Amino acid sequence: MSMTASAIQPRPHGRDEVVAAIQAAALELLADRGPREVTVRDIAAAAGVNHALVHRHFGTKDELIRTVLREESAAIARAASDRGRDTAGLLALLDEHPAYWRILARTVLDSPDLLDGVDMPAADAFVHLVGGARRGASARTNTAMAGALVLGWIVFGEHLSRVVDVDIDGADLAVAVGRVVSSR
């Protein structure tokens, strides 16, 4: 007899466990395949719950995606408040939340309308980290430029390293981001 995921992992019980399992499964699957390629049934199966529970707790797949993005963004903002304004702290936040950045990139590419109206506290946290004491358009411009560099690297870095035959490690990336961030 083969072991199934449900035989190995107990099914979640109660509202809090079910919601947490659905969000964790959505986070993993959305980061892996993007919003267009993931179904409610995929998420429910990975969470070990009936797909009707996804609808009960989140309404629609789109609302689940928005919830995952909003909650991960809030977690990043909380973590950012404990960091200094250095490049290492900024990059550590990226390393600690890779699924969020992949979901964000995939959502921007696949279904940008899903981001309309989603509160993203991580954006304000990055404005503070990158822009520092500066306020207004220039701090936000620097943040957008640094964000584009880093998110672009997350999405295309491996491919670009192969194409241009260069091996860029975390330290080299930190130096490159540091140059952009410090050019404020």
What are these regions (language model features)?
Residues 77-81, 111-144, 175:
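Amphipathic alpha-helical packing segments from all-alpha helical-bundle domains
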Residues 52:
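Key DNA-contact positions within bacterial/archaeal DNA-binding proteins
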Residues 1-33, 37-48, 59-67:
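Basic, helix-initiating cap at the start of DNA-binding domains
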Residues 1-9, 92, 127-135, 155-184:
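C-terminal peripheral helix-coil segments that are non-catalytic and often amphipathic
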Residues 21, 63, 103, 141-148:
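Amphipathic alpha-helical interaction segments
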Residues 92-128, 157-160:
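Amphipathic alpha-helical segments used for helix-helix packing
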Residues 74-108, 136-143:
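Hydrophobic alpha-helical connector segments
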